[in-house]
């Protein structure tokens, strides 16, 4: 992941309250060009931008197209701090809920959430992003590795 999640939630809060989040603006105005160049130089051949379907939706689509599954380490996923607070205060866009429902309905029992992962954390993974980061299958310096692919189908979050 090349950018933190949470922009959609903060945009939703902004619409409701007028609160402005400079960290969200910075994320949305940062281009993916440098990350894309680094990914190309690292030999990465599978990537997508995380936008309207959220991380989970885009990850599901990549996995389905490639015939693989994925494991996500929630503690490694970058999230804007204000988004965590906003989710706990109920500022959850309807689109994020629909994204999560769509992934769950497509994966059924192959969508698994570990006991230590909260509902708030899962909804953050489904948050629709504006100018989101890149989800890469591989590793580039300076960006967190949030999980890995596997031959077993489905998505597991721990």
Regions found by a protein language model. Give the residues of each.
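Helix-biased detector of long, well-ordered alpha-helical tracts
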Residues: 1-158
């Amino acid at each position: 992941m090349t950018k933190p999640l949470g922009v959609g939630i903060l945009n939703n809060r902004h619409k409701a309250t007028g609160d402005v989040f400079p960290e969200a603006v910075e994320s949305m105005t940062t281009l993916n060009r440098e990350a894309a160049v680094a990914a190309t130089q690292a030999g990465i051949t599978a990537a997508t931008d995380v936008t309207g379907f959220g991380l989970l939706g885009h990850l599901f689509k990549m996995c389905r197209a490639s015939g693989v599954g994925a494991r996500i380490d929630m503690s490694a996923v970058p999230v804007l701090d204000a988004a965590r607070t906003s989710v706990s205060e109920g500022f959850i866009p309807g689109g994020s809920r629909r994204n999560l429902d769509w992934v769950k309905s497509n994966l059924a029992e192959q969508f698994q959430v570990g006991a230590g992962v909260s509902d708030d954390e899962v909804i953050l993974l489904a948050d629709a992003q504006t100018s989101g980061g890149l989800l890469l299958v591989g590793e580039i310096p300076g960006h967190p590795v949030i999980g890995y692919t596997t031959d077993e189908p489905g998505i597991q979050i721990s």
